[in-house]
Amino acid sequence: GGCIVEGTTIATRYQWKNTVGPVENRPINISRWNYTFPHKKFPDYYQSYGLGFFEYFQLSEDIGAEPLPVLNCGLSCQFENEGMDQHVPVDKLQPYIDDALDLIEFANGPITSQWGKVRADMGHPASFNLKFIAIGNEQWGPLYPERLEPFVKAIRAKYPEIKIIGSSGPDSEGKDFEYLWPEMKRLKVDLVDEHFYRSPEWFLNSAKRYDSYDRQGPKVFAGEYACHPTNRENSFLTALCEAAFMTGLERNADVVELCTYAPLFAHVDAW
């Protein structure tokens, strides 16, 4: 998931079908983050796809976790693209919708299906029992729900048992956040992904954030949260503030169905 699925351009978005099959045949792809480290002399942060969706599904199975793939909704990174040339028109979305449907088939389909056979040929004839799929990452504005809607309709029609996750955008409050939550309710997504990269004070003051959330609407997926002081370093203070926030997540488990610390798998120097 994350901004990787968007790509700096629509051509460099994460395409899951390039990440399955024989490892030696998988293409490389430029990473959304390849230029965001000023100390690096070269834009050398590429994706080899040696670790793809099949391997992620295997990892989830091995550690007893539920896989939650995030797919592109037809929008490249909106921070990087204010115009429309790197966004897919709504009437051209069918290949992207097919990618979502095919991924569910790859994860859960019988070995007699096209993508179930690919999974079986890779050594896993049994279903991965995928339960969740997220469409879009930190998208915002009307561009997002108008693209999300046909995905929701198609997935509901073919795989009604799959829980669909929409996004509340990159902010934890404000104009875009307030716009997207009613849209997610209108589209009847199952969960809404909220992201928080905020100060220690914010985390301490937000322990009761979900006490007053609507219990009749979509559930919450706190998909990215991390306490960021000025220097963004981890410390006892940041851990304490995150723990305070987590008491609110646990207390409101009837509405906060899922949560994930970011980064759940830490990296070192962009590797």
PLM region descriptions:
Residues 58-59, 153-156, 160-163, 181-186, ...:
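Catalytic-core region of carbohydrate-active enzymes that cleave or remodel glycosidic bonds
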Residues 1-162, 166-180, 186-187, 204:
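N-terminal catalytic cores of secreted or lumenal carbohydrate-active enzymes
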